[in-house]
Amino acid sequence: MLRITELKLPIDHPEEDLRPAIVQRLGIASDDLLDFTLFKRSYDARKKSSELCFIYTIDLTAKDEAALLHTFADDRNVNVAPDVSYKVVGQAPADLAQRPVVVGFGPCGIFAGLLLAQMGFKPIILERGTEVRQRTKDTWGLWRKSVLNPESNVQFGEGGAGTFSDGKLYSQIKDPKFIGRKVLHEFVKAGAPEEILYVSKPHIGTFRLTGVVENMREQIRALGGEVRFQQRVTDVLIEDGQLVGVELDGGEQIHSKHVILALGHSARDTFRMLHGRGVFMEAKPFSVGFRIEHPQSLIDRARLGKYAGHPKLGAADYKLVHHAKNGRSVYSFCMCPGGTVVAATSEPGRVVTNGMSQYSRNERNANSGIVVGITPEVDYPGGPLAGIELQERLESHAFVLGGSNYEAPAQLVGDFIAGKPSTALGSVEPSYKPGVALGDLALALPAFAIEAIREALPAFEKQIRGYSLHDAVLTGIETRTSSPLRITRNESMQSLNVKGLFPAGEGAGYAGGILSAGVDGIRIAEAVARDILGLEA
């Protein structure tokens, strides 16, 4: 199989033009092209004056591929296609003594459980929240009625925090074994649109993710796995440094010497329990900030120029970073084109925001986190739980600033830059539900973060015209950008000091986003299989 890269066609080209373009690129007869698939499709809109093209990477089979490779020996855009197929590490023995346990059923837990089930290990999966459809109802209860269910919300429940997001499926992680392709293929098998296999920035969207997650759950069950909801792990059972099981909130004990912790970044009670049991963990950097909303049409014009609104391009996104004079870095986080800002708390008396988009990305506003990096040594010394304590203080204060009713504190960008409280909305209507309370966001975060963001917003104007629009809205606060701690693991992917405990995913500090969490779930399932089967890594 061969791979062609950098094959360019106008964005309005008919689908049937792709085959002739491949044939022309290789200089072969049409009959000599046996088959082809899209591996990647992207575009580069940085030069507004140039005609916009789709840029394709194509995998193909052809007659006499050896001759073609010889002909294009000096052409870096024609090569042998790499083997991106996934190969399991082994199969479970027929006499498996104990089933592995997976704690958490977000992206990491789903893919860990799915892979273990595909290898015949019949995992027991424990999720503290509810099934995704009930979870959706509970989440809307907060958004519409300010009623929070601490065990069923944006953070907890089937599908994890990624269910209520943009459903982004791209990552900057190194993936030499192409495990990310396995993740994408499994999503497609479960009902995700096939285009996620080749578009450069794939996403599924919240409503579509719901059905995909349900289908993956049923795949696991069909393979002999067990998925249990409203099962919160309250203790780990350890004997002489060896994990032997977990205890649930109802008192039930499940015995296993292989437990994957796929907790997500908001399981603060579980982190505290693990710390109390002596499981090694350490503080890690994370970021805090606000959500910013602009009209999506403004972002489209700034990013796509004359192609703004083109049906083949959809809503434009962006990625920004600014290094402030005070030494802090400010960057856009989890940008959601055509989406909404959502209430994402999982704890009573606290306010935290996140962003969400549907597959269509057709809401009126674009939103993104604008966040500032913070470090444990400088900003929250005091041990591995200090970051959690900082998050809790900030979120509790945001609750008060919003009126103590789950409304969020908000401010117009122009007023924030000028250092004066907002008293009325302008042309941009905030999307956060249950609502916002206008005021002064300088009261919501540490002074160094406010200073850095105030400097960054006008600087971002140089990259996106209109970014510092006076009426754009900042909504607070964004604190759960990533886990504030890492449950450190060794080369066998087990806890440093508790054998049989396999920390994984975003909550353990080893992923950030759906794709990287899914990849880590597969890697951790492989590690469990190798340990059970006595295989070397």
Regions found by a protein language model. Give the residues of each.
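Residues forming the flavin
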Residues: 1-52, 58-537
